[in-house]
Amino acid sequence: KDKNKKNTYDGKISLNFPGSEINTKYKIIDNLISINSEKSNLKKNNISYEGIISASPFYYNINVNLESLNILKFIENLSKLNHLLDEKILLDKKVNGTILLNVDYLKGIKIFDKAKIKINFVNGKLILNDSLLISNKIGKMYFNNSFIEIVEDRKILKSKIFFEIESQKKLYQKLQIPKKNRIKLENIYLEVEKDLDIDEIIINKFIFNKQITNTSLQKSIDLSDSLDINEINSLKNWIEVKKFSKNIFSNLD
């Protein structure tokens, strides 16, 4: 038997359901599977993807490009799939891989236009480091030390979020903050925590103008202890978010 001879297969898989058509071309060489999309759409939005899947050892690396994504519906659907975040399924320590999701247009969110969401499954953790929300006019929001892990049978999300503001004028206009209450704002920093089975979020840190380097000219303002978490968790729409933001800036010393 020729040990150098490789087992090679190729083909195409098509999935059709209301408003969507997913066509995947694949090629299998021994334990390695490569996939590519072909003229696919998801809920009438164009989608393309490519990647590799290794059967032994098992891992995957997949890039997905989405024409648009409704972020609120995406989060809602994720909560419905909460049961998949289980030690025996996606958070199994034997499941390792990376999915990079590039979104050209975000729906359902007022400030941000695009997204790059990097999802890593590593040794029982879902890691979101290097994920990014982009506002063409205002700035970029970076997610660092962001992960989901199981702690005492609870699925816990933790994240450090850094919102780099490139145009404070545009941000203030978006939030309708009166000019008399505006400050020089370079960034907003948050540390958040959420039990995925509970409909509330905990904010451990909330800082305006976090000092990143010694050359920063703006004074850091730590609001972590003054936030009303119950009020934050009760926010239901953009009007309430703007009202909440106005109250924060009007109460700054």
Model regions: which residues?
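Membrane-proximal interfacial segments on either side of biological membranes
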Residues: 1-253
